[in-house]
A protein has these predicted regions:
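Collagenous Gly-X-Y triple-helix signature in extracellular proteins
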Residues: 1-187, 193
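Short acidic DE-rich linear segments
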Residues: 197-203
Length: 203
């Protein structure tokens, strides 16, 4: 199969398991990506907990969602377990840290990469709690408004979108396809022809 050289830099878009992802950060041996669009609306936790690793959304992302990526052709061995800080937005550290293959951005991560994260016509969850259960706030989780500002919502709300984030091993880049949205018209035509040729070869 012909390899496609992908120019990877922050704000680039790649396709992984059929999911278009924005590259947020490039390190020596890994890249951080965020889903370009929401994968759908769902609760942070059906039981109304704002502690991310205990929630149904975290379990879905690291279970069924990974299976879906794999079914769509993703090399899921390239997913890197990542530890994120669950310090609440008011500074409480009750929830500690969690290590997951697929996660939501925290408020701090969102602020760090805000300039290259496009707004969506949707609200979407972050992993950070507004405060914690010990302070009387067991259910409020932070989220991003459609204009990019932040708000808080009860975790059982099913009306907010989900943008999965994850680290990939840099070595996988040779096998990834660039997102078609990244091409000029001329490049798009060449890429479509290339993919059609590859499809014909494998039939």
């Amino acid at each position: 199969m012909t390899k496609t050289n992908i120019k990877i830099a922050p704000s680039s878009v790649i396709s992984y398991g059929g999911l278009d992802c924005i590259v947020l950060d490039v390190e020596q041996d890994k890249i951080l990506v965020l889903a370009k669009e929401s994968i759908g609306n769902m609760p942070f936790d059906e039981g109304n907990s704002n502690n991310f690793p205990k929630g149904t959304l975290c379990k879905y992302l690291n279970g069924e969602f990974i299976k879906t990526l794999k079914a769509n052709g993703a090399d899921t061995s390239a997913l890197i377990p990542t530890t994120i800080d669950l310090t609440s937005d008011d500074g409480l550290k009750d929830y500690g840290e969690t290590t997951q293959k697929i996660f939501l951005l925290t408020c701090d991560m969102y602020r760090k990469y805000r300039s290259i994260i496009p707004n969506l016509d949707d609200w979407w969850w972050l992993a950070t709690a507004y405060s914690t259960e010990s302070n009387g706030y067991a259910s409020l989780a932070r989220y991003v408004y459609s204009d990019g500002s932040l708000g808080s919502r009860r975790a059982y709300s099913g009306h907010l979108g989900v943008r999965p984030a994850f680290y990939l091993k840099s070595s996988i880049l040779e096998s990834l396809s660039p997102s078609l949205s990244e091409f000029t018209t001329e490049e798009l035509l060449k890429e479509v022809l290339r993919r059609n040729a590859e499809s014909t070869e494998t039939e």
